[in-house]
């Protein structure tokens, strides 16, 4: 092993909106805040999802390829209809099927919990 993954970092124009959204989706607290970087993780000793301030960030236009996605996240859920309802209440934008966009426009998929993950 060369190293261990620290964080997956997403550019976003509004740190609070992105971190709060993902904190609610993942059920994890915001563990770090600075002027230009916030982290959502299990606690401050674990890797997590981080947000880097990028005022000029242009969100992907998926499925239209004119502004391609650089990354997307898959979120395993136990109750797909309930998860869809809850992410919409948090401000997610429905793109197609089980694909949504977070407040900064990053696509993510809601996927039924696979049997190996239970």
What is each model feature region?
Residues 2-3, 9-49, 54, 82-85, ...:
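Core segments of cupin and vicinal oxygen chelate
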Residues 14-15, 68-107:
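Vicinal oxygen chelate
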Residues 40-44, 100-103, 113:
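Active-site beta-strand termini and strand-to-loop segments that position acidic
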Residues 41, 62-65:
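Short secondary-structure boundary/capping segments
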Residues 56-62:
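A short, acidic/glycine-rich surface segment
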């Amino acid at each position: 092993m060369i190293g261990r993954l620290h964080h997956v970092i997403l550019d976003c124009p509004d740190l609070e909106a992105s971190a709060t959204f993902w904190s609610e989706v993942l059920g994890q607290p915001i563990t770090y805040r600075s002027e230009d970087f916030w982290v959502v993780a299990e606690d401050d000793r674990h890797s997590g999802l981080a947000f880097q301030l990028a005022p000029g960030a242009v969100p992907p236009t998926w499925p239209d390829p004119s502004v391609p996605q650089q990354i997307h996240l898959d979120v395993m859920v136990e109750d797909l209809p309930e998860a869809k309802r809850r992410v919409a209440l948090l401000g997610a934008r429905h793109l197609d099927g089980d694909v949504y966009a977070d407040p900064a426009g990053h696509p993510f998929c809601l996927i039924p919990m696979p049997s190996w993950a239970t």
